[in-house]
Amino acid sequence: MELFWLEHKKLWRKKIVKICVLLCFVYYVIFGSILSFQWFGFGSSDDYTSAFGNNFDGYTVIKDSQEYALSFGGELTDETLQQIVSDYQQMEADGMEEELEKTDWQIVNSWLGTLYPELRDTSNYKTMISYVDPDKLTGFYERRQQVLDEFLEVSGQVGAEKEYLHQIERKVEKPFRYEWVEGWSTLLGSMVADLGVVMALFLGIVLSSLFAGEWHDNTSTLVLTTRNGWGKIALAKILTGFAFTVELFALLAVSSIISQLFFMGTAGWDMPIQNIKLIAVAPMNMLQAEIYEYAFVLLGAIGFAGIVMFISAAVKNNVLTLLLSLAVVYGPMMIAEYLPYEMQKALDLIPLVGSSTDIFRTNTFRIFGKLIWSPYLLITIPVLIGILCMPFAIKSLSLIHI
């Protein structure tokens, strides 16, 4: 334990570590969360052509949007949808453009496009919510089931796989609860989901020197001949790497959650994720989805840390270790679209390469003849990969010692 604390203090004393943690915090928490809520994502706009020209009033817009959504009764039924669309059209007709910003028009418009494609007027430049006849918006859940079946058929997910996904979907409670959806859509679709990609860069920079740095600083001989032995030193460094990973995650996640609670509170936590993507099959509410996404990032980051430490022990060069580590994550992301679908799914099992947003998808793996929904594997395999890398990292050091 004493060696661990020494290595831990040694790591945190490095200026590059402090700079990386600060930059990561500023990028993800300040820009990616606080300013995104208050300005970039939810600040009101003077017109619908503004992108980054939003006003600095996101908190007020979010609270107004939540209050407006509550006026529709809490359950999503045909009547609720008709009322939402009718109310939007009335506000638009009255020229109440500022009031339109507090509606869930983007989410509702995606529902209309998915469930009522026959009502789309291709000659009309406006969004569907602006012109569809509310009285024709009936059979919401029957249409959703039909769209889901058609999607599975088109995706080639038939037979046993289709039935397996239906078994998962039957656990989804209906009718759906309805509150303000857009905030949760942004939170789960990008804010939390992008955390792993951000952490990968800074973990690569910090941990690449954990073992390789000893050769760079010409202290490898001292490390390998210390009275504690290379084995204990290696274990202390490995524990330090994992501890730093958890600490960085905790700093970012806790800060982001505090920001989320300040701006959004807990309103809408019990809505199903189907409000974001209708054909999702996961029986999860928003809170459960957020917990999954954070767990995905944490376990993936631990797995990635294991890979970085293995490369650092084997390569013994800071720069090369960093490049190889980043290639592990960003390389598959860049080439995935050019690969066969099954190979894309396999690459998703690499730590931090896959996406926590797979909970919105219907991807499955078939292992030894048994179907497994992809989110189950995406949260377990990456951390196992990182842990399995540790014996090889220690072995690399032992070979050098010999």
Where are these regions (language model features)?
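Alpha-helical transmembrane segments of multi-pass integral membrane proteins
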Residues: 136, 344-398
